[in-house]
Amino acid sequence: DWIACDVDSNSINSDRFGFLSDGRIVAVTYEYSDNDPSKQQVLVLNRVDAAAVTTKTELTLACLYLDYNLRSQIVKFNKSNPDYRIVVKDYSEYATDDDYNAGLTKLNTEIISGNVPDILVNGTELPIGQYAAKGLLEDLWPYLDADPEYSRDKLMTQPLNAAQTDGKLYRLPIDFGVTTTVGLGKVVGEYTTWTLADVNDALSRLPEGATVFNKYYTQAEMLQYCIAMNAGSFMNWQDGTCSFDTDEFRALLEFVKPFPAEYDWQSDSDDYESDYTRLKNGKQLLYPTSLSGFSDLYYTFAALNNDIRFIGFPREDGSSGNAFNASCTLSISTTCKDK
C-alpha cells in the first residue's frame, strides 16, 4: 500500500524498483512539474514498528478506482498534516470479471449497515443523487462560505452551480472541463437556438453526403449523446422515474435513424481525414469535444482558422447543449465527525 507509506505510486518508475538484501524496498521516483524543475529521487522504505508511528485522526475515503491527480494530493496531505490522515478504501478491488459492480454493491451494503465513509469520491460510478436524497451527504456551501481562503466568491461558481441539487452542493469537483460541439461559424453561427430541427436545417446546407458528426458514429453512440444532454427531459431525479413515451424522444429516434447501426470498416477505402479537415471541407457539421484548458481552445481556434462556434449538442428546450465534466468529485458524509 504505497499511500500508507506516503508515496505516490504514480511517480514510481516500474523498472527501477526492487528489494534490498535486508528486506528494505528501494524505488526511483520521478515528479514532473509545469512550474518548478522536475525531480527524480531514490526512496528507501524501512519497516518500522506500528507503535512508533505518530497517531493521527483517520478520515476514511471511499472510491471506485482512485483518480490519478487525487492520489497525489492525498499523499501530499498525509505527509504535511500533523493531525489528520486520509485512509483510502478502493472498492474496485471487489470487482470481478463476472460482476463489475461488486465493489459498488459492497460499498452500498456497508453504508446500509451504518459503516459510512467520511469522504466519497465519485467519477461516474456512485449514485450521489440517491445518497444526497437519503440525507447521507453534507451541503458543502456553508463550509466554502466559512472558509477565508476558498469562499465561493474566490472560485469559479459556474461549475459549482451546475453541480448543485436544489441549491445544495453535495459534491465538489476537483477540476472541470466543458463537453460541447464545435462547428464553423459560417455554417452554424446564425442559429439562436440549436434543436434537432436546427441541426437538420444546417446539415441540409452542406454538400450531399455530409454527416452531423464523424462518419464513424453509430445510431447507439448518437442516441447516447443526445439522451445524456437531454436527460432532464426524460428523467425525474426526485422520484426516480423516467418516461420515453414522448414526442421529444420519438424525434430523437428519427434523428439518429440515418446513422449506421454499425460502421462498415471493411468497405471503407477512403483516406483518413481528421474532424477538423472534414469540417473545413463541408463533409461534417459538428465535432464533439471536451475542453479542459486554454491549450484545447488555442488548438481548436488554430485548426479552424478562428472561424468557430461552440454551439453544443441539440436540446429541444432551447437551453445550452454544453455540459461541465469533472475527473471526479468529493463529498462529505453527514456522519463524519471531523468536518
PLM regions and their residue ranges:
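Conserved N-terminal structural module of periplasmic/extracytoplasmic solute-binding proteins
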Residues: 1-127
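Loop/turn elements at helix/coil->beta-strand transitions in domains of secreted/extracellular proteins
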Residues: 82-85, 114-118, 168-169, 207-212, ...
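Short helices/loops that flank or line small-molecule/ion binding pockets
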Residues: 98-116, 120, 129, 201-205, ...
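Hinge/lid segment of periplasmic solute-binding proteins
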Residues: 125-180, 192-198, 307-312, 331
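A ligand-binding cleft/hinge motif common to bilobed small-molecule-binding domains
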Residues: 126-130, 291-306
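Short helix-loop capping/hinge motifs at secondary-structure junctions, enriched
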Residues: 170, 186-194, 335-339
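Glycine-centered hinge/linker elements that transmit conformational signals in sensory
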Residues: 239-273, 313
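Extracytoplasmic/periplasmic substrate-recognition and gating elements
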Residues: 301-339
